[in-house]
Regions:
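Rieske [2Fe-2S] iron-sulfur-binding domain
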Residues: 2-8, 14, 21-146, 341
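Short coil-to-beta-strand transition motifs
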Residues: 14-17, 243
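Short, acidic/polar N-cap/turn motifs at the starts of alpha helices
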Residues: 19, 31-35, 42-43, 117, ...
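C-terminal catalytic domain of Rieske-type non-heme iron oxygenases
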Residues: 63, 135-341
Length: 341
């Protein structure tokens, strides 16, 4: 008998095989490293000679946090990451080129090398990090660069809700009339239309139509949601006269902390600063409404075993995503090998 998949938490091994947003681009500077966490592991991220780099936040000498150090300039003019404890210095490839206590002619061990993240990249105004080779590519956000779209970002928050819970909630539509009654939910919505759910590779997509309350007016809108083997999800909302694109990016920092990035776009604002501010405020409110429920859960663990909960047809998209994450988790477990008692 196949063992039931373990619940998904913020430090589950599968998150090490995924891209995660870890900072706004302007938060990563060239003068000092920033400390970020992914799945319980700390990384030092900085820019060396216009190159974005991320290393395990430990100097191999005495395991001091590199993020406590700074960026210095070598004799050749190149930028170097420097440990604050004993001054060991590293180039953009993680190679140590100076140990002050040995002098400039000292013999530096090949082991004096930093461990890099598999990948670090910049997209949509965010810095993304993949600790190990990711199963899925960076999440797509086509509206971000679409002509006529006004781009903004919602307030970045830290929450005790897990990345899995946040994405699962983002994919769900049956909670709109209840959780979002004060924003866009329609109280007498009725049964949720079945829509369609498809899985292709490491991505699930759901398409359905639901009512949407825009101020005092209720209109029908088409919802297209996608999520993959990572802690991010995308939605495209098509309403009469307006298209909205949203990317929810979750950084699973530790077992009980997640940083939430929410990027938003719409094509009917133009240069109207007042309408843009109102749009951002509404999206902030929607996230706050979701967190008011999610943060009341006693645990951040998301069941991946379908037998752990009772599902209906309205849950098809989130169930498909959980199945995908269960498959991804199983693949990562096979690569790691079974636990040794």
């Amino acid at each position: 008998m196949t063992a039931a998949p373990a619940p998904l938490g913020n430090v589950s091994p599968v998150w090490r095989r995924a891209w995660h947003p870890v900072a706004h681009a302007e938060e990563i500077t060239a003068d000092r490293p920033a400390r970020v966490e992914v799945a319980g592991q700390a990384w030092a991220v900085t820019r060396l000679d216009n190159r974005l780099v991320a290393f395990d936040d430990q100097c191999p000498h005495r395991l001091a946090p590199l993020s406590a150090g700074g960026v210095s300039t070598a004799a050749d003019g190149a930028a170097r990451l420097t440990c604050a404890y004993h001054g060991w210095r590293y180039d953009a490839d993680g190679r140590c080129d100076l140990i002050p206590s040995l002098g400039r002619d000292g013999n530096i061990s090949e082991r004096a090398r930093l461990r890099p993240a598999y990948g670090v990249s910049e997209a949509y105004g965010l810095v993304w990090l993949a600790p190990l080779e990711p199963l899925a590519p960076l999440p797509a956000f086509p509206e971000w660069d679409s002509p006529g779209m006004t781009r903004a970002r919602s307030r970045t928050v830290r929450t005790r809700a897990s990345a899995g819970q946040l994405v699962d909630n983002f994919l769900d539509a049956a909670h709109f009339p209840f959780v979002h009654a004060a924003s866009f939910g329609v109280a007498d919505e009725g049964p949720l239309a079945a829509g369609s759910v498809t899985t292709a590779g490491w991505q699930v997509t759901g398409l359905f139509d639901t009512p949407y309350r825009d101020g005092g007016v209720v209109v029908s809108h088409r919802v297209i949601k996608t999520a993959g083997a990572h802690g991010s999800a995308h939605v495209r909302l098509e309403l009469p006269g307006v298209t909205i694109g949203i990317l929810l990016g979750c950084q699973p920092e530790s077992a009980d902390a997640t940083r939430v990035f929410k990027l938003i776009t719409r094509d009917d604002i133009g240069g109207d600063a007042g309408r843009l501010a109102a749009f951002v405020k509404e999206e902030d409110q929607i996230l706050a409404e979701d967190l008011a429920i999610l943060e009341r859960y006693p645990s951040g663990l998301l069941p991946l075993d379908p037998r752990a909960e009772v599902h209906t047809r309205a849950d098809r998209l989130s169930v498909a995503w959980r199945k995908l994450l269960a498959s991804a988790s199983a693949e990562v477990l096979v690569e790691r090998g079974p636990a040794v008692a």
